[in-house]
Amino acid sequence: MILSQAGYSEDVIVAGVLHDTIEDTDLTLDYIGNRFNTRIADIVEGCSEEQHGTLPWKARKQHTIEYLKKASCEVRAVACADKLHNVRSMVADYQEQGERLWDRFNAGRDEQEWYYRGLVLVLCNRLNQEPAGSIFHQFKDTVEGLFSRHQAE
């Protein structure tokens, strides 16, 4: 697991495991807070788009980018690990499927690039404070590799 390998605390790791539960299950933040603790529930809440689910794709993603500008270090770490996992999967799928990869998303390649490069700007704006090889460096490098690969073809 990305957060564990990066040396984050147990609370951050647990929040990383639970980060999609509010969006994808019937579990509530109260349940998470009572079952685990309020710090984990707060991190999970910070990673959730649930309250914005009715907005169009681009508006939801713009909200995510704006929110992450002010989010706690823990929320930023969980979000970065989640997005790093997503981009790594996209890279692997791109190697197998090529341009067909983009057909499976609600938004096409250009919109995905806008979103992921926007996330890089927000999540990786403190790279000089991060050790080489951190999840933030890995995320930036993976996003650049995915979208540079596309442009080179």
Where are these regions (language model features)?
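Active-site helical microenvironments for divalent-metal-assisted chemistry
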Residues: 1-153
